[in-house]
Design a protein with these regions (language model features):
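A small/polar active-site loop signature that marks catalytic segments
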Residues: 35-38
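Metal-dependent nuclease catalytic core centered on acidic motifs
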Residues: 57
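Segments of small-molecule ligand-sensing domains
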Residues: 123-134, 141-190
């Protein structure tokens, strides 16, 4: 909470609100009661010097940080709330106060298909490591069919792409990057952006 207060200039913005309420109370404004009631519903007053907040958290911690932001008048309707891959945590669909919420992730349809296959094979839900290893095994198989062992080093040095079951992987300079989709949760719905 202390970090959130610092990045949102909470104390200054809280003081701005108190000063504005006091100014209106002492004014001759005919609508001052209405204005004061509206201001009293807020926690702070004043602008913020950022457009988005990246929340590097999951589960209840994500919800806690997001709620703390709400109490400093950082609202997802005015600022982008972006987080890490939430693995399609369905509980976030019901957290309408922190929506819209944006995050990168693997393709949802491919993920759902994989979960069904995994459950049918092992009678339990897959963990995240099994998901990534699923395509890694596919990559190794693909490479073994299309290359001899001596050329593997060359394959990882030049630019290549591999389409796995759960996504597309780019290979370049001995690094593998997984192309992710970007999703938004808004009004209790999961929306694929790209």
């Amino acid at each position: 909470t202390k970090q959130i207060e610092e990045i949102t200039n909470y104390k200054i913005r809280k003081q701005n609100l108190e000063d504005e309420i006091k100014r209106i109370k002492n004014s001759n404004d005919p609508n001052k009661e209405k204005k004061i009631k509206r201001l009293e519903k807020r926690y702070t007053l004043g602008g913020l010097n950022f457009d988005a907040v990246v929340i590097a958290d999951f589960d209840e911690s994500l919800k806690s940080v997001s709620t703390s932001l709400l109490y400093t008048d950082v609202l997802p309707k005015n600022k982008y709330f972006i987080t890490l891959n939430q693995w399609f945590d369905e509980s976030l669909l019901n957290e309408t106060d922190i929506q819209p919420l944006y995050y990168p992730s693997i393709n949802k349809e491919n993920f759902d298909s994989y979960k069904i296959k995994y459950f049918n094979a092992f009678n339990e839900d897959p963990n995240h490591l099994s998901l990534l290893s699923y395509d890694l095994v596919g990559l190794v198989y693909y490479l073994s069919l299309n290359s001899n062992v001596e050329n593997l080093n060359k394959i990882f040095k030049r630019k290549n792409s591999f389409k796995g079951k759960i996504g597309i992987f780019d290979i370049k300079n001995n690094k593998i990057n997984h192309r992710l989709n970007f999703y938004k949760i808004k009004e209790k719905e999961l929306i694929k952006i790209f």
